[in-house]
C-alpha cells in the first residue's frame, strides 16, 4: 500500500555489456534488470558487478548504478557458480551422512578439493559413497530449489550454526563484532558463504564429483569452454603443500579463521608466531638438506607472488 501511494522513481542503469543505459523501476532486483536490458549472455547470467562490486541477482537497485552482467566465463561468475555447487554438495552430505564433517580444503586440480571425515569411524571414502552423493546432488538440482538469503542477529546465527555442527562458522561469527549476520538457505539447509550464489539449483548444469586422493574433488566448468568440465590436472607438489599446511594448522590448533581470531583475543599471538617460525625453520632446513644432497645443482630458483618474502627467504 505504501509503495502504491509513494511509488519509487525509476533507476537508470549504465550497462557495461551493451554500452547503453536503460531504466528500471526503483527497487527492482538485478534479475529483473537483466530481463529488461534485452541482453542475452550465451551461457546465461549468474551474477553481476554493481559499481565494480560483485552482487547476486537478488540485489535490489534503489539508485542509479553501473552494472556488468556476468556468466561463468568471468572469474567472479565462476566463483558464484562454484559456491552454489558447494552448497548443493553440503546439503547432499547433510542428508546422506549427517554425522560426517565436510571441509572444503582448497581449489586444486581444476576443482574444489573436499575432505569428508567422521567423528567415530575411519575416513575411507568409497566409490559407492561418491556415487550416492552425486545422485543426491542431481536430485537437489532437479528439484529447482531457490538459493535464499536471510538475516538475523549474530548471536542467533552463532546458536544456529553451532546447533547444526558448523562450529568453525560459529567461531568466526563470534569474532566479527557484527550485530547482524546474513546467512544462506537451501531448502531446510542453512549455511554461510562469503559471496553471491545463483538464484536456483536448476542453473547448475555442468559439474562432477569424483574420488580424489584421500578425499573428493568437486569438478567445475571450464570458463574457456563453458559446456565442458575443467580438465583434470595432477598437481602433486601443490597438493603436498596444502596437506602440510593443514598439518601445521592441526599442530597449532588453528583450523579456521575463527580459531585464529579467538587465539589472538586470548593473547596467544606471540605463541602462534613462534610455533609457525619453528615449523618454517624446520622446513627451510629440510630444503637446504635436499639441495646439499644434489652436488651438481648450480642454481636455485625461488618463485612467489609480490611481497611474499622471496628476498628474505633467500638470505
Pin down the residues of each PLM region:
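P-loop (Walker A) phosphate-binding loop of NTP-binding proteins
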Residues: 305
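Ubiquitin-like/PB1-type beta-grasp interaction modules and other compact soluble beta-rich domains
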Residues: 2-86, 90-92, 96-108, 119, ...
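Hydrophobic positions on the alpha1 helix immediately C-terminal to the Walker A/P-loop
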Residues: 313
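Hydrophobic anchor at the beta1->P-loop junction of P-loop NTPases
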Residues: 300-302
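Conserved glycine(s) of the Walker
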Residues: 309
Amino acid at each position: 500500500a505504501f509503495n502504491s501511494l509513494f511509488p519509487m522513481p525509476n533507476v537508470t542503469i549504465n550497462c557495461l555489456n551493451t554500452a547503453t543505459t536503460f531504466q528500471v523501476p526503483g527497487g527492482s532486483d538485478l534479475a529483473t534488470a537483466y530481463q529488461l536490458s534485452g541482453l542475452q549472455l550465451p551461457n546465461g547470467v549468474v551474477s553481476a558487478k554493481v559499481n565494480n562490486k560483485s552482487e547476486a541477482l537478488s540485489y535490489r537497485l534503489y539508485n542509479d548504478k553501473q552494472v556488468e552482467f556476468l556468466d561463468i566465463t568471468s572469474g567472479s561468475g565462476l566463483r558464484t557458480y562454484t559456491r552454489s555447487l558447494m552448497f548443493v554438495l553440503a546439503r547432499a552430505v547433510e542428508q546422506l551422512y549427517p554425522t560426517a564433517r565436510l571441509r572444503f580444503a582448497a581449489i586444486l586440480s581444476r576443482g574444489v578439493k573436499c575432505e569428508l571425515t567422521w567423528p567415530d569411524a575411519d575416513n575411507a571414502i568409497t566409490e559407492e559413497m561418491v556415487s550416492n552423493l552425486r545422485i543426491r546432488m542431481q536430485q537437489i538440482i532437479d528439484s529447482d530449489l531457490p538459493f535464499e538469503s536471510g538475516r538475523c542477529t549474530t548471536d542467533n546465527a552463532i546458536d544456529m550454526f553451532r546447533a547444526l555442527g558448523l562450529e568453525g562458522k560459529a567461531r568466526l561469527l563470534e569474532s566479527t563484532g557484527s550485530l547482524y549476520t546474513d546467512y544462506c538457505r537451501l531448502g531446510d539447509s542453512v549455511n554461510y558463504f562469503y559471496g553471491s550464489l545463483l538464484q536456483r539449483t536448476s542453473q547448475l548444469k555442468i559439474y562432477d564429483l569424483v574420488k580424489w586422493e584421500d578425499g573428493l574433488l568437486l569438478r567445475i566448468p571450464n570458463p574457456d569452454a563453458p559446456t565442458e568440465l575443467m580438465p583434470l590436472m595432477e598437481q602433486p607438489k601443490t597438493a603436498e603443500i596444502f596437506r602440510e599446511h593443514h598439518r601445521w594448522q592441526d599442530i597449532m590448533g588453528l583450523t579456521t579463521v575463527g580459531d585464529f581470531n579467538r587465539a589472538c583475543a586470548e593473547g596467544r599471538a606471540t605463541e602462534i608466531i613462534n610455533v609457525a617460525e619453528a615449523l618454517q625453520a624446520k622446513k627451510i632446513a629440510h630444503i637446504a638438506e635436499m639441495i646439499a644432497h644434489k652436488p651438481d645443482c648450480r642454481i636455485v630458483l625461488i618463485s612467489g607472488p609480490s611481497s611474499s618474502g622471496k628476498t628474505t627467504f633467500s638470505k
